[in-house]
Amino acid sequence: MELDLIWILIGLPAAFGLGWLASRLDLRQLRIDNRQAPRAYFKGLNFLLNEQQDKAIDAFIEAVQNDPDTSELHFALGNLFRRRGEYERAVRVHEHLLSRGDLSAADRQRAQNALAKDFVKAGLLDRAEDALRKLEGTSFEGQARLARLAIYERSREWPQAREVATQLEASGEVSFSVRKAHYLCEQARELNAHGDATGAAQLLHNAMTEAPDAPRPRLLLGQLQLNQGQALQACATLSQLFESGSVAAPLAAASLVRAAQAAHQVPSALSLLQQHYAQSPCIDVMDAIVALEKTDANAEQQVRQRYIEHLQKQPSLLAASRWLAGADLGADDTRAPVQKALEQA
């Protein structure tokens, strides 16, 4: 009994000493680990600042291994992988972050946004769209919608693009009316290509309502009406571009000529073209004027004179080539503007 008591008295101090020594060793190891993680982290930053991305990645991997619970290191590493085009590794890093149960709500949103960027950069648009949808209702919602809009435009998914553009407008972003009209125009072209001219015309009317000042819906509608044999309606639609002074009006000049000739509206169309040309000289409008004036008896002489006048107002190689067709270069008063145009071409 006395012997047992002696051993107990001897063992208690020894056990206490061993416990104290073990705790000191654990504390020392913890301090070493904590020093190693920041050291590796700052080493990675140094490499990054010196544009040594390979070494920076190695340093960040070391830091993550030493402190796997540090989310900032994961974000830094994932972003580095994405910048280098190593999208699969970036995806793995950000998916690992999302799998952690202790991640804060803010960091979870950041990781989801980073993962969506990985998919976009990798060209995995379906997975990117799914990842971006999960950001609805977060602080990244606006950015995510813009990214989805870019995806839909890239993949020509016009109804979805229009839906997202409407959401962006409702959330206080800038007006997307012109882009939404463009989506309707693209849908109209697809319908027309499949033989649904009526449906295409309806979409173009909707586009005109969406963006009254956008020139493309009227231009496409006028061309559609012309191709459908509705020359008078086409003439009225295309004339609106010139009456409004649209900068895109010259693009409709050739179609207006065809519509006016088919609808027997040459005098009114010619007057409209001449008024527009007087305000904004343009070779496309001049070509249209010449085309409508060619019915006159002295058409050839008038054509040459028109292009000479245009060369004096707006020297260009294209106008000079129009005049040169069958022209006599002998006269000095005509040679000078032609020469000037050729020199400036």
Task: Briefly describe each language-model feature range.
Residues 43, 77, 115, 148, ...:
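Structural register within alpha-helical repeat arrays
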Residues 33-69, 82-86, 121, 186-194:
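Alpha-helical segment of the N-proximal tetratricopeptide repeat
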Residues 47, 81, 119, 152, ...:
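Residue at a conserved register position within TPR or TPR-like alpha-solenoid repeats
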Residues 68, 102, 106, 139-140, ...:
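Short coil turns that delineate tetratricopeptide repeat
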Residues 38, 72, 106-110, 143, ...:
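Start-of-helix register in tetratricopeptide repeats
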Residues 91-99, 125-136, 159-171, 196-207, ...:
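Alpha-helical repeat scaffolds
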Residues 1-35, 130-133, 137, 142-150, ...:
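Long, contiguous interaction/recruitment modules in multidomain scaffold/adaptor proteins
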Residues 50, 84, 122, 155, ...:
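Structural motif corresponding to the intra-repeat A-B loop/turn of tetratricopeptide repeats
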